[in-house]
Amino acid sequence: MYLSLLKSLNRLSPRAWDFIQLTRIDKPIGVYLLLWPTLWAVWIAGKGAPSLQTVCIFVLGVFLMRAAGCVINDFADRKVDGHVKRTEQRPLVSGKVSPREALVLFAVLVGLSFVLVLFTNAATIWLSFGGLALAASYPFMKRYTYYPQVVLGAAFSWGMPMAFTAETGELPAAAWLLYIANLLWTVGYDTYYAMVDRDDDLKIGVKSTAVLFGDADRVIILTLQGLALGCLMLAGARFELGACFYIGLLAAAGCFAWEFWSTRERERDACFKAFLHNHWAGLAIFLGIVADYAVR
């Protein structure tokens, strides 16, 4: 229904559809992968009953900043995307959207996100500048380092400390366990994503953890996912979470095991499905957190 509604805009205004594709509004998987860990932090910070204002600010913020991240990513990659099978039809490559239009849209999305942050507090506002720096720098890292996924993980996790300061005005040390867990998880699932493009990336010199890890990719991903679960277990102990939370972690572990098995042949489609599948792991952990507070 959601996608059908968006596609109806294509019939009414093909120009609007170009910008929808640029912001990936038609592909909500990135929103989910950013939203679930942010909500982990929001719910834990609020001890199971976060304020409606905090929830609304962070849900809308996730939507806007994910869109902004997609725009700046395509701007940075506009000269190489045409050489990659998966990205050769993106709006900036095809010329349907100009680089100037993309930068203006990025500025608008970031500006709207900042307006949301203004409804929080000084600590959260200051933290937001770090998030912007990470989001804007990630797309350019592929040119200089084999670890752009680490920068992406740092950016995707930045909403977690912000959630604590927004909800409580404080940033407990244990919140960084959640941050590290999400960073490790993000590096893992985005390596699956990078495996889809690895053959093309090797030809054009684009760097990624998929290129760096080589044949050890799946084992390293599973290790990263295991370390992420370990950090979440430590965080659960620090925040005094109970059985429901750990059941959520067990469900996530099952997701990770399935991904490892399904990518044994390293086929492009299988790697992409494994990337998408991480949404369910994030949701399982979130539901575990919600249930744990609900049954108290």
Curated annotation (Swiss-Prot):
It comes from Pseudomonas syringae pv. syringae (strain B728a). Belongs to the UbiA prenyltransferase family. The keyword Membrane applies. The chain crosses the membrane at residues 29-49, 52-72, 102-122, 146-166, 169-189, 219-239, 241-261, 275-295. It holds the Pfam family UbiA. Pathway: Cofactor biosynthesis; ubiquinone biosynthesis. This is 4-hydroxybenzoate octaprenyltransferase. Its main location: membrane. GO terms for cellular component: plasma membrane. GO terms for molecular function: 4-hydroxybenzoate polyprenyltransferase activity. The keyword Kinase does not apply. One of its GO terms (biological process) is ubiquinone biosynthetic process. It is found in: Cell inner membrane. Its EC number is 2.5.1.39. Catalyzes the prenylation of para-hydroxybenzoate (PHB) with an all-trans polyprenyl group. Mediates the second step in the final reaction sequence of ubiquinone-8 (UQ-8) biosynthesis, which is the condensation of the polyisoprenoid side chain with PHB, generating the first membrane-bound Q intermediate 3-octaprenyl-4-hydroxybenzoate. It catalyses: all-trans-octaprenyl diphosphate + 4-hydroxybenzoate = 4-hydroxy-3-(all-trans-octaprenyl)benzoate + diphosphate. Coiled coil: none annotated. InterPro entries: HB_polyprenyltransferase-like, Prenyltransferase, UbiA_prenyltransferase, UbiA_sf. Keywords: Cell inner membrane, Cell membrane, Magnesium, Membrane, Transferase, Transmembrane, Transmembrane helix, Ubiquinone biosynthesis.
